[in-house]
């Protein structure tokens, strides 16, 4: 049946709504398998993230996998992308670790967002303790992680706000979630 279906589509590319780039340290090298290890055995550290990659496979998106070196070699690679996804725990190959110390990476992604590109972070995206921040894109995401360095800072931005994006949604379920994440003062909180 697969061969018949393949013959019928004649190599035609399906309609894609947007182009989505999964950003990690592997890029194309581990495309579609970036949250699986050792023949997809269950791993507590990454099983929560595998569903994100899996959901992309059935969505009407043109999905590409890029790494940080791709951005350094050709910052224009982001010009053709609508949304970047950075998924995983901090300081891992999933999210980038020390790559976030490179100002060209930060500048390229901030420019991408400033020019209307979307970015989705799940887990600890851009998470790497450096220059007084844990999330290197804290000002883009509007959140920071408490790692003990800012315990004495006031963190009073807890009020939730209504937003059209949640109007027809059921209760938001974040799954396991991450602890010690707080909103920055000017961030608009939709759900905690």
Predicted regions and their residues:
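The substrate-binding groove and active-site-proximal loops of carbohydrate-active enzymes
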Residues: 35-45, 86-102
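A short, well-structured beta->alpha microelement
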Residues: 56-75
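A glycine-centered loop/beta-turn motif at secondary-structure junctions
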Residues: 15-20, 26, 32-34, 58-59, ...
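A glycine-rich, often tryptophan-bearing local segment used as a flexible ligand/cofactor-contacting loop or short
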Residues: 96-175
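Short catalytic/ligand-binding loop motif for oxyanion handling, primarily in non-cytosolic enzymes
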Residues: 29-32, 72-73, 93-94, 127-133
């Amino acid at each position: 049946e697969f061969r018949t279906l393949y013959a019928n589509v004649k190599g035609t590319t399906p309609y894609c709504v947007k182009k989505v780039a999964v950003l990690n340290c592997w890029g194309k090298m581990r495309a579609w398998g970036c949250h699986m290890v050792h023949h997809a055995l269950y791993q507590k550290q990454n099983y929560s993230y595998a569903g994100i990659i899996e959901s992309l496979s059935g969505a009407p998106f043109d999905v590409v996998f890029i790494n940080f070196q791709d951005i350094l070699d050709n910052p224009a690679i982001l010009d053709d992308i609508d949304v970047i996804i950075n998924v995983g725990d901090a300081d891992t190959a999933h999210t980038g670790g020390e790559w976030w110390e490179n100002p060209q990476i930060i500048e390229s992604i901030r420019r991408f967002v400033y020019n209307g590109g979307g970015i989705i972070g799940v887990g600890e995206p851009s998470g790497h303790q450096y220059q007084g921040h844990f999330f290197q894109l804290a000002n883009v995401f509007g959140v920071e992680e408490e790692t003990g360095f800012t315990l004495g800072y006031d963190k009073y931005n807890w009020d939730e706000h209504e937003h059209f994006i949640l109007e027809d949604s059921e209760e938001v379920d974040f799954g396991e979630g991450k602890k010690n994440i707080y909103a920055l003062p000017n961030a608009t909180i939709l759900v905690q």
